[in-house]
Amino acid sequence: MLEDIKENKLKGENNMNVISLINAKGGVGKTTSAISIASLLSQKYKVLLIDLDQQGNATGNSGVDEDNLKFTSKDLFLDESLKMEEIIINTDKGYDLIGSNLEVADTSINLVSKLNREYILRKRLKNINYDYVIIDCSPAVDLLMYNALV
């Protein structure tokens, strides 16, 4: 499958490829797909998996205890003073992770009053060095999903 990935795809400002798994229905395989894609790509590329789902299944299935996270994807959006290196977790799965848990549930509500709220994730990812960023979204149409699309 790695051979099937074409190099002429759309790339971000820093040549990073972003793949967002989005579906407004739960239980359709977003998390399983996100983890599988991250695992496969990490065999050849530097990969970051971002868990935006408050259930934290991508986090837990990446071997990280979602109940004991120092920082979550909530901090990614709401605390821009934190360096990305502080939020990113190195996993033993071959890819890095920004984890999630129930604390992420109110993140979208807290973004409503922020300027350029749809571009926060794009801005935060701008200066990190990954070949691929895989984003596992929750089954909600909210500002986190919009950030994953932009």
Regions found by a protein language model. Give the residues of each.
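P-loop NTP-binding core
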Residues: 1-150
